[in-house]
């Protein structure tokens, strides 16, 4: 196997084309773990962009193949042989979401006294708190815990572990996180130690891992992944929750909200809150 030279692939175009390409990436059999984002770049021009960061030659070729099928302008550049993502994010400002203050080491000297301060360093795992989906989850969770506490919490697609760590730091007795990406699991474990949070993380696809099933059922499930996995996991998430339990769904675009909601409402869930941030949506639903 040859070493892969890190690349960034950027595709720009109309919203419908960018969203269709993103759906195609999600459904491509060779791109299950591909890292990409989709966002609105210029509202006046109706311009959207996809940023993709392949890690292998196969991912690189697969992404280019998918993007070539849509009327998007695709450019690419070679990234420096360095921890380029950490370098790009190291200067990010802290994020405030309700009672939560998410920061990096560069902001350690200006922490508010009245917040739950969570140190999450920039890196390859998703979930520094800056993305609209993660902020939406934190905002929804902050509102929920004003009324009640959640003793047992599951975080599906944990990334940096931020959401499970936030739960552990605000009174959850059990906080379990899963991710399909092994480096993310390692990073989330490190973040739990740094934040002195009693949260456990495992490498798992779906909800079948023994650590997940042994601690079920849960009072609260976070699922900050993508729209199609959210739909396919609807029944498993229902099974993992106690009757009356809560799920916070994120990782979906506003345009995908209706179909994701339908998968849960058809199983008896009730929508109790919605949060929109940028192009992203978060749904809070209660199990019957």
Swiss-Prot record:
<dbReference type="InterPro" id="IPR004498">
    <property type="entry name" value="Ribosomal_PrmA_MeTrfase"/>
</dbReference>
<comment type="similarity">
    <text>Belongs to the methyltransferase superfamily. PrmA family.</text>
</comment>
<dbReference type="GO" id="GO:0016279">
    <property type="term" value="F:protein-lysine N-methyltransferase activity"/>
</dbReference>
<feature type="binding site">
    <location>
        <position position="179"/>
    </location>
    <ligand>
        <name>S-adenosyl-L-methionine</name>
    </ligand>
</feature>
<dbReference type="GO" id="GO:0032259">
    <property type="term" value="P:methylation"/>
</dbReference>
<dbReference type="InterPro" id="IPR050078">
    <property type="entry name" value="Ribosomal_L11_MeTrfase_PrmA"/>
</dbReference>
<feature type="binding site">
    <location>
        <position position="224"/>
    </location>
    <ligand>
        <name>S-adenosyl-L-methionine</name>
    </ligand>
</feature>
<dbReference type="InterPro" id="IPR029063">
    <property type="entry name" value="SAM-dependent_MTases_sf"/>
</dbReference>
<feature type="binding site">
    <location>
        <position position="157"/>
    </location>
    <ligand>
        <name>S-adenosyl-L-methionine</name>
    </ligand>
</feature>
<keyword id="KW-0949">S-adenosyl-L-methionine</keyword>
<keyword id="KW-0808">Transferase</keyword>
<dbReference type="GO" id="GO:0005737">
    <property type="term" value="C:cytoplasm"/>
</dbReference>
<protein>
    <recommendedName>
        <fullName>Ribosomal protein L11 methyltransferase</fullName>
        <ecNumber>2.1.1.-</ecNumber>
    </recommendedName>
</protein>
<keyword id="KW-0963">Cytoplasm</keyword>
<feature type="binding site">
    <location>
        <position position="134"/>
    </location>
    <ligand>
        <name>S-adenosyl-L-methionine</name>
    </ligand>
</feature>
<comment type="function">
    <text>Methylates ribosomal protein L11.</text>
</comment>
<dbReference type="Pfam" id="PF06325">
    <property type="entry name" value="PrmA"/>
</dbReference>
<keyword id="KW-0489">Methyltransferase</keyword>
